[in-house]
C-alpha cells in the first residue's frame, strides 16, 4: 500500500495558494496507520532512542504510537501556554511575525537520544525550534522524522544544513 495515496490534498487551505496535505484520511485507514507506525518503528528499532518528541498536534498521534512500540517515553512539544508547570520555550520566525513552542523543563535528561517526529515538514521552523529545545535540555537529536516532506519548501534541506539528520516517509512536490 502506498501511504501517499491515502493523504488527501485540499487546495487553497487555509489560504489561497496553499496545498494542504491532510493526514486524517491516512489516520482513519487502519492499514495505512499501521504501515506508517511500523515503518518508523522498523527504522529506529535498532537505534539508541531514549525518548520520542512529537510536535503539536499531529506529531502526537504517530509519535506516541512509535514511542510505545519502541518501549520509550513520549514528550510533547506544544504551542505557547499549553503546557502546565515549568517550561522552556523557543521563538521561531513565521512569514509574518513569530511563534513559540515549549517543552517541560524536565522532559529530557542530559545525553538522552531523542527522535523528533511530526506529521509534515514544510519550511522547517517548528522542527528547528523543537530540536533547539531538546538540545537546550541536554538531549541529542537522533533524527527529525516526518510522514510527509515538502522538498519545494526547503525544510529538510534547512535542517540538514544545521546538522540534523532528516527522514520522510513520502514527499509531495508543489505540482502534486
UniProtKB/Swiss-Prot annotation:
Keyword Transmembrane helix applies: no
Pathways per UniProt: Purine metabolism; AMP biosynthesis via salvage pathway; AMP from adenine: step 1/1
Keyword Lipid metabolism: no
A biological process term (GO) from this entry: AMP salvage
Domain of life: Bacteria
Pfam families in the cross-refs: Pribosyltran (PF00156)
Gene3D superfamilies: 3.40.50.2020
InterPro entries: Ade_phspho_trans, Adenine_PRTase, PRibTrfase_dom, PRTase-like
Gene Ontology cellular-component terms listed: cytoplasm
GO MF, one annotated term: adenine phosphoribosyltransferase activity
Catalytic reactions on record: AMP + diphosphate = 5-phospho-alpha-D-ribose 1-diphosphate + adenine
Subcellular locations according to the entry: Cytoplasm
Enzyme Commission identifier(s): 2.4.2.7
Keywords, alphabetical: Cytoplasm, Glycosyltransferase, Purine salvage, Transferase
Protein family: Belongs to the purine/pyrimidine phosphoribosyltransferase family.
Assembly: Homodimer.
Primary role: Catalyzes a salvage reaction resulting in the formation of AMP, that is energically less costly than de novo synthesis.
Protein name, per record: Adenine phosphoribosyltransferase
Gene expressing this chain: apt
